[in-house]
Amino acid sequence: MDGVSTAILLLLLAVISLSLTFTSWGKGQLPPGPKPLPILGNLLQLRSQDLLTSLTKLSKDYGSVFTVYLGPRRVIVLSGYQTVKEALVDKGEEFSGRGSYPIFFNFTKGNGIAFSDGERWKILRRFSVQILRNFGMGKRSIEERILEEGSFLLDVLRKTEGKPFDPVFILSRSVSNIICSVIFGSRFDYDDERLLTIIHFINDNFQIMSSPWGEMYNIFPSLLDWVPGPHRRVFRNFGGMKDLIARSVREHQDSLDPNSPRDFIDCFLTKMVQEKQDPLSHFNMDTLLMTTHNLLFGGTETVGTTLRHAFLILMKYPKVQARVQEEIDCVVGRSRMPTLEDRASMPYTDAVIHEVQRFADVIPMNLPHRVIRDTPFRGFLIPKGTDVITLLNTVHYDSDQFKTPQEFNPEHFLDANQSFKKSPAFMPFSAGRRLCLGEPLARMELFIYLTSILQNFTLHPLVEPEDIDLTPLSSGLGNLPRPFQLCMRIR
């Protein structure tokens, strides 16, 4: 059977299957939603170029729990703090499955810590959390690595001599080096080909997956597998990244000492040796490669993207930048780098960083979840295996939780006495059982990097502050800041 005949047969089978699926639409206890069409689902009611905005608008028509069909796939969408919190935290076990994300799944095959499920996911997460803690995650030892890397970054920024530059690659190299030191055992020089390759693959994939191409692939993966486009580059990048990691793993195998692990890879290899005779073990080479990739991706792109958002925001609001610098000067001075111990004495700076994360909303739709059993929820019944999208943008912009959600306002995280206050609706790392395991590292990096930069430099835009556009470039996987250059002038 040739390719065309196969495609026609698959299309006919899909039509039959979808006709049966949509015949039962609206029956039972599913949440309400727009009526779907066979094959297309609700795509005519959604903008493929901006799925986030379309889903957010539908929540105003159908409420905080509604059903949509992304092509043939039925998805429950949750919006608003109370609803999302009830699902991810109060019913965390029921909503702990990982939903369909074809552009990732076609590479990971459900392997690795981010996209695995069930017992495999629980075992991998428990192991990874323990190993990351052993190598200093959230502790003084990892702080020392961040301070060291921060000093290298400051040296690079000084060499810009106050001239305009694009911060993307400079930030990515520095941020990526921290998670690389945990995974591979040492940092890379900034011109090391391996580091540059890692950053290229990660940055390129994050941009494509945040674009309409990435969104459409997740809706019609079988169709787009036959269509040329930038989505094909994602898989080439994935393959290149896997090869790079595999080379490093082979080098580790040649010098492995199980009694003296140097890094995450050593610990995983040792676990593989220990469970070699167990045919049901989840610790194998493919899992190691996928988990390492997940950690590199998560540990590089989101922090770098958040820092770029912070630069734009601080240039648009120079009074906020000046007040942060004033607090840094008062608490830290100029003779040493800021440390985590300083954070408790810097409530305004802490509030600004949290507000940047809320306002930038870097991962606005979260990664998809899935209910692992039939789940009663807010008067409806969500069938086992149903994918769930939690709109984190509607949490971070919930007017019941934040006084002026559409505005950048550090007062959202300050009490009447100007002391820092937490908000339960702060979920940039998601929440519940699928909470990002890199949260402690990311929070440390954001504080030390931003305060160190503002201690030494003032950020200057190339346009007037009022002309800076904070509207994100993409709203798929990630909210990316629009490309920009800036000048950093030594204070």
From Swiss-Prot:
Gene3D superfamilies: Cytochrome P450. This is Cytochrome P450 2F2. GO terms for cellular component: cytoplasm; endoplasmic reticulum membrane; intracellular membrane-bounded organelle. It is an enzyme of class 1 (oxidoreductase). Its cofactor is heme. GO terms for biological process: epoxygenase P450 pathway; naphthalene catabolic process; response to toxic substance; trichloroethylene metabolic process; xenobiotic metabolic process. Belongs to the cytochrome P450 family. It is found in: Endoplasmic reticulum membrane; Microsome membrane. The keyword Aminoacyl-tRNA synthetase does not apply. Its main location: endoplasmic reticulum. Its EC number is 1.14.14.-. Coiled coil: none annotated. PROSITE patterns: CYTOCHROME_P450. It holds the Pfam family p450. InterPro entries: Cyt_P450 (IPR001128), Cyt_P450_CS (IPR017972), Cyt_P450_CYP2_fam (IPR020469), Cyt_P450_E_grp-I (IPR002401), Cyt_P450_sf (IPR036396), Cytochrome_P450_fam2 (IPR050182). It is a peripheral membrane protein. Keywords: Endoplasmic reticulum, Heme, Iron, Membrane, Metal-binding, Microsome, Monooxygenase, Oxidoreductase. Involved in the regio- and stereoselective transformation of naphthalene to trans-1R-hydroxy-2R-glutathionyl-1,2-dihydronaphthalene in the presence of glutathione and glutathione S-transferases. It specifically catalyzes the production of a very reactive and potentially toxic intermediate, the 2R,2S arene oxide, that is associated with necrosis of the unciliated bronchiolar epithelial cells or club cells in lung. It comes from Rattus norvegicus.
